[in-house]
């Protein structure tokens, strides 16, 4: 401790060093990025492949399987899923947390190249990949609306100008455009007119394709000049396509307009997007891996005025959803809680010490310790987020403890008549080891957390490091700045304080005397106290087993995502009506601010909705209550279901599921999976622990099976290719030509007119021109019948899979839900060929649940080892750790009282309590050991004196920690659902621990002391005096 005396004798140097720490922290604070939570994204890569016209089963077997076999060999892949639908396949790879996304992308490209020879030759392009998780919620949604421009024109502006520019913004990973499709010239044929003229659909296709050909024409030149040849070989609008001559019939020209309606329209008419009941084009913006949401959103917002100026004034570019306001509001709430916590802690010190000068010392020590932590956060690449700021809020109650212990001890010597400088030297020497033990053992709690693997370890690393740094700074400041300030600020004089403060001093003295009397009685009835101590251990076990558990508290981010699932045979027209109906119901809710949705494209029976809630300050209910209220109204809509879930900052897995949690069924036999999945889904839907149960298995889509009579076809001179071309030309929205423009390329799309595409009997009107030039109706050589067919085929790994998604009912817990699912699977007697496993967030929850007790045990063991080293004793660390059971009981009872499930946040609270409550025991044990060794008194008298002597600092430190956590309990603003479990756990644990450990610790100390004496002397253990 002689080293620390230098800081007392050199106040200027000490002050300047303190200022340097504070200034460095302030500068670092201004440079720290802002985010809702630490970056814990699993690296995810999405691979897409297409084969137009292929059914889902063909896509799964010929495209998905070869890709999966090659991709599955990549190192670090922890989950591989695929979904194959009509003409397209998407494979999602999720990698280990420590896998570099760029290195993984190179391996993915190599695997795609290796699988290329095994893929079908008819694929229009090679499979491509993107470093974006398709299940992530967008960070921003923009909408384009206009009263003068068509949806196709708006889509063109969005995809050609806006999306390209936004995608170049730093931090943006992907920009997808929905609600319509690119402009196109649509040729809608009349089969009856064509039949009367004897013209085949393929002849029309060839004529249009040949009429719009962009080819180089060359040039001519002489000795002086050169001319580039440019012909009018391109047709760019519907107006110039209509006069095209398709055929001559008896010398009369048959033009395209005679047999078709030709219009300027869009490539795919089966797309629809809306925002607040108005047609809209929707741009959903996702962030790149590891990109900061706030910084990315700010960059996009900075570009918006320029983007608006680049499009016509009659087009409105609006922000439909933005993630950043609730993040900023949540962080502002945490910062406010931090300031309140500092104020409350300083108030506690003032009330106890009744001196403005004495209070000034921790009032300086606490902010400097916290502000200095920002420097370490910046150097470690951390961000200002809910968890790191919560760590500093909780640290307020910790960092003041060291200053309080030093200050209180020095004050005691000054009050006894010692000069301030001498009191500072003696006081810091007496409690230096105590302060060191308290701080080092508290930091030791976080060692297992820092070494923890997986998402929880990555998630709480910033929390643990930030808290540890602040505690380390507090230790340094309490041994340097605090004694220096005590030496030059404190004086021996009666405190001039208000009557209520003097009254508090008298009350504290009376409380201390009452504690002394009760402690004497307790030490005389130690067996009863020991029984209470053992009972708290048993109660801990029972409470932990019985309390509902969840992975992470349900956040209220002010955003909901909705997924519409309709009958598998629904038409686009009916699906669009469903979308409008659902949006109307949601929009009428008083807490809803904005609703955006779209349907169509390859999503034949589904749609998506993005819902923004009003700010929490003007809302009547939180997100979960809004969902529960809407769920009852939405259930009345026939033929479709809308599944709602609150957007969370932590979402694991790459599945685009309709709910927050997933349970995946896998089988090597697709037929067995299709047999058992409906039974399991029905049984799970009946569980009260689950809500919104649905499945991604869709094997009941309607199709029309055509059977060719090949002999008749051969006799009539018709090939299978002719027949397939007929059907594709008529019903496939076939893109038959390309229109080249300066900024983009557009298509000429051909199919039969809408009255024919909307009626199955139109097949009777289809015909083929055979090799003899005769029109042969399709019904002459083919028959058809309705049948069921899968809309998608899914894989997990290389097995056929079906994922059942579910939400939790209002007030439900994930532990009850997972237990209910496992219980149902056992009761159903599902065969071994069908396997079930939790996926995504539910899977991580199951893994975390298994490691929670191990983590707590590791923290206790680490603290024991550290204390054993510091005290050079096997016994005394056990005395100090005896404070933990009562803290655990208090924490779990408080969670039960507030109806909060045991989550990762609550687990961190338990870890913190391990570090907090042992401080009381350390102060008692330190002084008792010193009294025994140097004072020559008995263990009974030593611990009794230590308890009375340290009563005031124990009360001060406990109340400081309690008041430091209290703002987290009382918070009700944005992000409160994250902060409250931590505050509830700490406050509950401190209250119960304070009431019990003031009595159990001295009793356990005496028992262990006598046990130690027995081993030393080899004598029988005598009973404690009664």
Curated annotation (Swiss-Prot):
Keywords of the record, alphabetical order, are: Cell inner membrane, Cell membrane, Membrane, Transmembrane, Transmembrane helix, Transport
- Which coarse location class describes where this protein primarily resides? membrane
Output the superkingdom of the source species. Answer: Bacteria
Question: What kind of membrane protein is this, topologically?
Answer: Multi-pass membrane protein
Gene3D superfamilies hit by this protein:
Multidrug efflux transporter AcrB pore domain, Multidrug efflux transporter AcrB pore domain like, Multidrug efflux transporter AcrB TolC docking domain, DN and DC subdomains, Multidrug efflux transporter AcrB transmembrane domain
- The regions listed as transmembrane in this protein's record are 12-32, 333-353, 360-380, 387-407, 431-451, 463-483, 528-548, 853-873, 897-917, 953-973, 984-1004
Which molecular function terms from Gene Ontology are attached? xenobiotic transmembrane transporter activity
Record-annotated disulphide pairs: none
The reply to whether Metal-binding figures as a keyword in the UniProt entry is no
GO CC term, one of those recorded: plasma membrane
User: Its quaternary structure?
Assistant: Part of a tripartite efflux system composed of MdtA, MdtB and MdtC. MdtC forms a heteromultimer with MdtB.
**Protein name per UniProt:** Multidrug resistance protein MdtC
Please name the source species: Serratia proteamaculans (strain 568)
């Amino acid at each position: 401790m002689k080293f620390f005396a230098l800081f007392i004798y050199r106040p200027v140097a000490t002050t300047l060093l303190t200022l340097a720490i504070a200034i460095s922290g302030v500068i670092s604070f201004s440079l720290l990025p802002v985010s809702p939570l630490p970056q814990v994204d699993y690296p995810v890569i999405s691979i897409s492949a297409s084969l137009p016209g292929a059914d889902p089963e063909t896509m799964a077997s010929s495209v998905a399987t070869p890709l999966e076999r090659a991709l599955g060999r990549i190192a670090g892949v922890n989950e591989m899923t695929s979904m194959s639908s009509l003409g397209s396949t998407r494979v999602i790879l999720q990698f280990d947390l420590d896998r570099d996304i760029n290195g993984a992308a190179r391996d993915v490209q190599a695997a795609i190249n290796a699988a290329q020879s095994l893929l079908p030759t008819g694929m229009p392009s090679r499979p491509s990949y993107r470093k974006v998780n398709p299940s992530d919620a967008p960070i921003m949604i923009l909408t384009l609306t206009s009263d003068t421009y068509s949806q196709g024109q708006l889509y063109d502006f969005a995809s050609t100008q806006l999306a390209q520019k936004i995608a170049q913004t730093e931090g943006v990973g992907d920009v997808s455009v929905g609600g319509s499709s690119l402009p196109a010239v649509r040729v809608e044929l009349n089969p009856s007119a064509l039949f009367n003229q004897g013209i085949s659909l393929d002849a029309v296709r060839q004529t249009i394709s040949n009429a719009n050909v962009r080819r180089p024409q060359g040039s001519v030149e002489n000795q002086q000049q050169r001319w580039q040849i440019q012909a009018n070989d391109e047709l760019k609008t519907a107006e110039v396509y209509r006069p095209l001559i398709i055929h001559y019939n008896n010398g009369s020209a048959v033009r395209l307009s005679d047999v078709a309606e030709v219009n300027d329209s869009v490539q795919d008419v089966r797309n629809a997007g809306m925002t607040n009941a108005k047609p809209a084009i929707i741009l959903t913006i996702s962030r790149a891996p590891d990109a900061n949401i706030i910084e990315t959103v700010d960059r996009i917002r900075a570009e918006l005025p320029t983007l608006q100026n680049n499009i016509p004034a009659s087009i409105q570019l609006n922000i439909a959803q933005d993630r950043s306001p609730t993040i900023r509001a949540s962080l502002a709430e945490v910062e406010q809680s931090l300031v309140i916590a500092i104020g409350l802690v300083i108030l506690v010190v003032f009330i106890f010490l009744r001196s403005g000068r004495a209070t000034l010392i921790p009032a300086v020590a606490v902010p400097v310790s916290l502000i200095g932590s920002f420097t370490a956060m910046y150097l470690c690449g951390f961000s200002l987020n809910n968890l790191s700021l919560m760590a500093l809020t909780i640290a307020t109650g910790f960092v003041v403890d060291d200053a309080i212990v030093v200050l209180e001890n020095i004050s005691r010597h000054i009050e006894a008549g010692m000069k301030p400088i001498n009191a500072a030297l003696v006081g810091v020497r007496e409690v230096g080891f105590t302060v060191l033990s308290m701080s080092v053992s508290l930091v030791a709690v976080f060692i297992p957390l820092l070494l923890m693997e997986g998402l929880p370890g990555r998630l709480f690393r910033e929390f643990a490091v930030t808290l540890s740094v602040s505690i380390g700074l507090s230790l340094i400041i309490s041994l340097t700045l605090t004694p220096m300030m005590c030496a030059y600020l404190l004086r021996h004089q009666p405190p001039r304080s208000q009557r209520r403060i003097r009254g508090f001093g008298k009350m504290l003295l009376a409380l201390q005397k009452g504690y002394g009397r009760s402690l004497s009685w307790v030490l005389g009835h130690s067996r009863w106290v020991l029984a209470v101590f053992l009972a708290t251990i048993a109660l801990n076990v029972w409470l932990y087993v019985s309390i509902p558990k969840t992975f992470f508290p349900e956040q209220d981010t002010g955003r909901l995502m909705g997924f519409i699932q309709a009958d598998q045979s629904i038409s686009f027209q009916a699906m669009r009506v469903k979308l409008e109906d659902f949006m109307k119901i949601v929009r009428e809710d008083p807490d809803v601010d904005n609703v955006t949705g779209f349907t169509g494209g390859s999503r034949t029976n589904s749609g998506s909705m993005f819902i923004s809630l009003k700010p929490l300050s003007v809302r009547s209910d939180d997100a979960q209550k809004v969902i529960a209220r809407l769920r009852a109204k939405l259930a009345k809509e026939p033929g479709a279901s809308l599944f709602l879930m609150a957007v969370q900052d932590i979402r694991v897995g790459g599945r685009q599921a309709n709910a927050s949690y997933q349970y995946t069924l896998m089988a090597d036999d697709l037929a067995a999976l299709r047999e058992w999945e409906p039974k399991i889904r029905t049984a799970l839907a009946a569980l009260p622990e689950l809500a919104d149960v649905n499945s991604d298995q869709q094997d009941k889509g309607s199709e029309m099976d055509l059977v060719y009579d090949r002999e008749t076809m051969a006799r009539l001179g018709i090939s299978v290719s002719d027949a397939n071309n007929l059907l594709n030309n008529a019903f496939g929205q076939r893109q038959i030509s390309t229109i080249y423009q300066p900024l983009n390329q557009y298509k000429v799309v051909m199919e039969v007119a809408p009255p024919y595409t909307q009626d199955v009997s139109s097949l009777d009107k289809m015909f083929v021109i055979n090799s003899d030039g005769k029109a042969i109706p399709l019904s002459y050589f083919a028959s058809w019948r309705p049948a069921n067919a899968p809309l998608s085929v899914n894989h997990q790994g290389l097995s056929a899979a079906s994922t059942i998604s579910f939400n939790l009912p209002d007030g439900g817990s994930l532990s009850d839900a997972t237990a209910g699912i496992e219980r149902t699977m056992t009761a159903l007697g599902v065969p071994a060929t069908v396997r079930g496993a939790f996926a995504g967030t539910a899977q991580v929850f199951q893994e975390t649940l298994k490691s929670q007790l191990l983590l707590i045990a590791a923290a206790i063991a680490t603290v024991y080892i550290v204390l054993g080293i510091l005290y050079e004793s096997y016994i005394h660390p056990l005395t100090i750790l005896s404070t933990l059971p009562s803290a655990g009981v208090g924490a779990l009872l408080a969670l039960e009282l507030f109806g909060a499930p045991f989550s990762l946040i609550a687990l961190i609270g338990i870890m913190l309590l391990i570090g907090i409550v042992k401080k009381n025991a350390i102060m008692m044990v330190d002084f008792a050991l010193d009294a025994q060794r140097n004072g020559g008194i008995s263990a009974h008298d030593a611990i009794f004196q230590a308890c009375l002597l340290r009563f005031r600092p124990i009360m001060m430190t406990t109340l400081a920690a309690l008041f430091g956590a209290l703002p987290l309990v009382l918070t009700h603003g944005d992000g409160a659902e994250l902060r409250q479990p931590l505050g509830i756990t700490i406050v509950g644990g401190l209250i119960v621990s304070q009431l019990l450990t003031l009595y159990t610790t001295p009793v356990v100390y005496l028992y262990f002391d006598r046990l130690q004496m027995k081993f030393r002397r080899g004598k029988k253990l005598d009973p404690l005096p009664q």
